Curated annotation (Swiss-Prot):
Signal peptide: none annotated. The gene is mglC. It comes from Salmonella typhimurium (strain LT2 / SGSC1412 / ATCC 700720). InterPro entries: ABC_transp_permease. Pfam families: BPD_transp_2. One of its GO terms (molecular function) is transmembrane transporter activity. One of its GO terms (cellular component) is plasma membrane. This is Galactose/methyl galactoside import permease protein MglC. The complex is composed of one ATP-binding protein (MglA), two transmembrane proteins (MglC) and a solute-binding protein (MglB). It is found in: Cell inner membrane.
C-alpha cells in the first residue's frame, strides 16, 4: 500500500470507522430477525431515543468544554424517584404520601429540575472554582447522589413506586397514532429540547463561550470570557436536562426505583462521541448528538430484540465506547 493510500485509509478510518462497525452490527441484527424493522419496533426505538436524547444533550454541553459527568445516570434516578412519589394517583392504595394530593405536573417538573440544577451547580463550583477535574468531581457526586436517592427510597418504602396519576401517565406515555406507527409525546418534548439547545449553541453568546472554552480555556479567558461562570451555568443546565429526563423515564416505564438511571451516563457519553462531540473540546453539533443517540439506541434495542445475553451487550457497548474515543483521539491528535 502506497504512503498516499495508507494516509487516505487512516483518514477514512478516523472519520467513518465507527459507523462501519455500527452498520455491521445493525446488519447482523436484521439478518438474525428481519421483523426488527417493523413499525412498532421503530416507534419503540424512537420513544427510547427521545429520553436518551434529552439526557445526552446535557452531557454533550459538558464534553464540549472538555468536561464530563459520571453522575448523570444517578441524577436521572433521583429525579425519577422524587417525581414518582409526588405524582402517584390518589386512588393508589400504596401511595407513598396518602394524605398529600397529587401535585400538578408543571410543579413537579420545576421541583425536580431545581434539584438537578442544584446538583449541577455543586459540580460546577467544585470544577470551576476549586479546580478539581470533572472526572473526579462527578465520580464523587455520582456516589453521593446515589446514596441520597437510596436513603429517600428506603424512607418511602423501598419498593417500586408506581400507580401514577392518569394525567402524568398520559403526559409520559401518550402518543399520536399514524397507522401502525406511534409518535409518542416524549418525542415532541425531545424535539423542543433539541431546538432549545441548537439555539443556545448556535445563536447565543453563551453558546459561543462554551465552544471557546472547550477549544482553548486560556485563550477564552484572555478574550474576556468568564470561564468559571460559564462552566457553572453549563453544569447547572445539564442537571436540569437529567432531571427532566428522569421524570419522563419514570412515566415512560410506569414505575421508579433507586436503580433507575444506572449506566445511563455511559450510554450518553458514548452516543455523544459517536455523534462527533470530541473529548478534545470545542467540537460538536446538536444533530450529531441526536444521530449518536439514535444509532446507539438502535444497537441496544436490536441486541436485546434478538436475544443477545445482557453480559455480552455490556462487552459490545464497552468496546464501541473505547473504539469511538480512540478514533476521536486520533482525529484530534495533531490539534492537541
Amino acid at each position: 500500500m502506497s504512503a498516499l493510500n495508507k494516509k487516505s485509509f487512516l483518514t477514512w478510518l478516523k472519520e467513518g470507522g465507527i459507523y462501519v462497525v455500527l452498520l455491521v452490527l445493525l446488519a447482523i441484527i436484521i439478518f438474525q430477525d428481519p421483523t426488527f424493522l417493523s413499525l412498532l419496533n421503530l416507534s419503540n426505538i424512537l420513544t427510547q431515543s427521545s429520553v436518551r436524547i434529552i439526557i445526552a444533550l446535557g452531557v454533550a454541553g459538558l464534553i464540549v468544554t472538555q468536561g464530563t459527568d459520571l453522575s448523570a445516570g444517578r441524577q436521572v434516578g433521583l429525579a425519577a424517584v422524587v417525581a414518582a412519589t409526588l405524582l402517584q394517583s390518589m386512588e393508589n392504595a400504596n401511595k407513598v404520601f396518602p394524605e398529600m394530593a397529587t401535585m400538578p405536573i408543571a410543579l413537579v417538573i420545576l421541583i425536580v429540575c431545581a434539584i438537578g440544577a442544584v446538583i449541577g451547580l455543586v459540580n460546577g463550583i467544585i470544577i470551576a472554582y476549586l479546580n478539581v477535574t470533572p472526572f473526579i468531581t462527578t465520580l464523587g457526586t455520582m456516589i453521593i447522589v446515589y446514596g441520597i436517592n437510596s436513603l429517600y427510597y428506603d424512607f418511602v418504602g423501598a419498593s417500586p413506586i408506581s400507580g401514577f396519576d392518569s394525567g402524568f401517565s398520559t403526559f409520559a406515555q401518550g402518543f399520536v397514532a399514524m397507522g401502525s406507527f406511534r409518535l409518542s409525546y416524549i418525542t415532541f418534548y425531545a424535539l423542543i429540547a433539541v431546538a432549545f439547545v441548537w439555539v443556545l449553541w448556535n445563536k447565543t453568546r453563551f453558546g459561543k463561550n462554551i465552544f471557546a472554552i472547550g477549544g482553548n480555556p486560556e485563550a477564552a479567558k484572555v478574550s474576556g470570557v468568564n470561564v468559571a461562570l460559564n462552566l457553572l451555568m453549563i453544569y447547572a443546565l445539564s442537571g436540569v436536562f437529567y432531571a427532566f429526563g428522569g421524570l419522563l423515564e419514570a412515566g415512560r416505564i410506569g414505575s421508579a426505583t433507586n436503580n433507575l438511571g444506572f449506566m445511563y451516563e455511559l450510554d450518553a457519553i458514548a452516543a455523544c462521541v459517536v455523534g462527533g462531540v470530541s473529548f478534545s473540546g470545542g467540537v460538536g453539533t446538536v444533530f450529531g448528538v441526536v444521530t449518536g443517540v439514535i444509532i446507539f439506541t438502535v444497537i441496544n434495542y436490536g441486541l436485546t430484540y434478538i436475544g443477545v445475553n445482557p453480559y455480552w451487550q455490556y462487552i459490545i457497548k464497552g468496546g464501541i465506547i473505547i473504539f469511538a474515543v480512540a478514533l476521536d483521539s486520533l482525529k484530534y491528535a495533531r490539534k492537541k
